[in-house]
Every structure is written in structure tokens, then in C-alpha cells.
């Protein structure tokens, strides 16, 4: 995979509003459906990316660990002509296989990804209950082939700080 730098949203930015189809149940999901008292985690993922595949187990664990404290949504913005394994049908299969209890949305036009300035997968955006961006970045410092097991340490630290009313400090990313 080529190294892709992402400009990402600035911290303190309000969550872009969107409506997309949930690949699992074909219903439209809107940001207005989020619980107003709960922080939100928006995850840009896809089915074929080796980095996302590397994180499957940890993503499942993390979302289960925080399901009572966060709202989750995953979005795939890939071109299914070039990546047929990222089609809504395949997204549904993966969501069922991994036990996703949250919406897995298909961004066919890539407009939502552009509004988040998401350039690669996976990318994580953690918003407070007022939909203000508190963290954007990686899950942890593991990657396919580097010998480090996924732990979610960077994202978990950000979530814990947010849930405990502490400042989320990006300088504390684990290298």
C-alpha cells in the first residue's frame, strides 16, 4: 500500500451532516439519528484494505467494549468498479460475519468521505456528544507485517479521555 497522507478535519470541527444507505438493511441512516447525549465514532473502512482486515478483531472488540458509551457508524467510500469486494452486498456479508451492531454505510459518490477529508482506510473520527471533533487518526501503531498486534491503544486512549471529561491530547499518540 502506498503511504497516503490525509489532511483530515480540523479538531473542533462540527460533524458534517450526511444521509447514506446502510448496506446491511438498505435503510437510510442520517446523522440526525445519533443520540444527542452520546459521543460518536465515525469509521472509514472497507472490505478489501489489508490494514482494515488486520484490524478486524480489534475493531470488533473495541466496538463491543464501548457499545454502551458511544454511537458507532462505519462508512465505505470505495469505487466498487475497481474494488468489487467493497460492494454493498459484500459489505453486508462482512458486517454479519464480524457481528457489526452499528450501521455500515455505502458512500457511492464519495461525497461524505470528501466532507470528512478522509483519504485512506481506516480512518477514525471521534466526536463528543455535541458532534464536535475531538480525535481523528489511527487505531494504533500496528500494521500488517510489522509484528505488532492490534491493541487500539491510540483510539482507546482518546475514547477514555473523552468519556472521563479529560482533554484528548494528540501528542500522546503511541509510537
What are these regions (language model features)?
Residues 173-175:
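Conserved small/polar residues in nucleotide/adenosyl-binding loops
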